[in-house]
Amino acid sequence: PFLMTYGDGVCDVDMNKLVEFHKEHGKIATLTAVMLEQQKGVLDIGGDNAVKSFREKSHTDGAPINAGYMVLNPEIFDYIDGDDTVFEREPLEKLAKEGQLMSYMHKGFWQCMDTKREMDMLEKYLATGTAPWKKWD
C-alpha cells in the first residue's frame, strides 16, 4: 500500500496506526474520517467501519467526512480512467458500493485550508509555535 493526501489540509493522525488499520481490513482503500459540520464529502459508515456510500460536497449535519488522508493499494489504479477522473466521485463512490473502502475515524486535530480565514488561522498556529499537527522538531 501507499499513502495519499490532498494538499489543502493538515492533521495529527498517527500514520502508522492508519496503515496498520488498512492492512488489518484488507480492502483496496482506507480513508481518514473526521466529524465536522460544514459542506464537505459525507460518508455513510457501517458498524464495521466499512464505507457504505460516499457523497461529495453536501451539508453534513454532523456526519463524518473524508479528511483526505488515505492508504491505497495499487489496485486503486484500476478505478481511475484517466486524467479527467474525479477521485472523490468515480473511484471512491465505486469502492464504497463494492465494499472496498474503509474509514479510519480520527478524533484528533484536523483542519482544511479552503479559505483565506483558514489559511490565516493555520499560519498563526505556525507563527506562534502551537501547530497541533507538527509532530517533528
Question: What are the roles of these predicted feature ranges?
Answer:
Residues 2-3, 10, 16-23, 36-37, ...:
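Catalytic-core segments of class I nucleotidyltransferases/pyrophosphorylases
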Residues 6-7, 31:
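Small/polar loops that bind or transfer phosphate-bearing groups
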Residues 25-35:
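A short, conserved acidic/glycine-rich loop-to-beta-strand motif
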Residues 45-46:
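Extended acidic/charged loop-beta regions that coordinate divalent cations
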